[in-house]
Amino acid sequence: MAEQRNINFLSRREALKLGLIGAAGLTFGKYAFGEDANSLATKKRGNAKAVIELWMSGGPSHLDTFDPKPQAGNDYCGPFKNPISTNIDGIQICELLPLLAKQADKFSIIRSMTHGSNAHETGTYIMKTGRKPGDNLVYPGMGAVVSLFKGYDSGYKGLIPPYIVLTAAEGRFSEEGFLGPRYKPFATGGDPSQKRFAVSGIVAEGISDQRQKSRRELLHSLDSLGKAMPGNKEFEKLDACEDKAYNLILGDGGKVFDMSNEKDELRDKYGRNKFGQSCLMARRLVEIGVPYITVNSGGWDTHKQHFEMMRRKLPELDKGFSALLADLADRGLLESTIVVWAGEFGRTPKVLWESPWNGGRGHYGNCFSAVVAGGGFKGGRIVGASDDKGEEVAGRPVSSADLIASIYELSGIDPDGPLSNPKGLNLQVMPSANRLKEIM
């Protein structure tokens, strides 16, 4: 068995040398990796087929998005003093989110998220894994766990990997953890708002499909010598991987990244920017069965000139997020797709007016907001509350473990079930976590 594992590793390495695949596990079946997740006891709960995670890297302000506090005064709300009503009575959000205000019946706001950490990496790890660091294990993020239970090990047949990040990954503390590289996300790179979306290892910038085909013909001619050797099983395996890789690049798999067939009107609704078009790409990936997609949006770490940044960021968020919800609903996909909006923490409720911050907000993990929609989550609700200045949780504290366990349960993954790990430890998927029962 050890010899077989080594052979599989070598064949994968050779494929990588040839530039055929851009991410771990991209084209290989179960033979190249370890334990089959089907052997794990999974208790069927919900029926959500996909999760779209809208990740606001840097930490978005809760006061300037989904938990406005105009009554707290200028030192807290700054220039955003006029929150707007939504299409749900009693729910108001920031005035720079008018399109989302019209979609409030589709999402619920959690205003009492808390974990207490003000460090980016720690906050990201807590929010992505539902665990606090401290032991010798680096736990897998939510995307990797969903990939374990709903990816290749559970019958996923898609050419596109089951865990996609648009466009840059967050890093090792929010990815595959101890599950290993098979469950690492495939980060596309590139920018889907560009004329040609250059996807890392799939759609090369400046390389036409015809040139890719010519390269394949050349590779076939070079392979002929090795394949002519009798009984050379490794070349046969490599050839199979090559076929899968090129089917991804030139076949139906690669077509999902070509948005030229999307109507201009719809693309405009999402916003002709990286975030908006990434949201549209996420919908396309859901349509072909990809179970977990992360859309990373940077620029939320607003220590300085916070409000100037928000005037640029919030309209992009408003268009992309609202268009995604409406588009999923119009296509009958929202009922089976969970959308979660969050960052690693919130930002200080009290504005830092003094120099050098000049109206900035710092990191704040004591109290912040998250948003969930679809896949079994009810819309038009508020979970928990912050105090009158947004500084502390005033009721119904919600941990990242509670949020993640609820997403797992609605995805058909038992949070109390066993979680495979390399040390053979008795670990559970998300133990001792509460559920957001009021909106499930």
Language-model-derived ranges and their functions:
Residues 1-440:
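Ligand-binding pockets and gating/stacking loops
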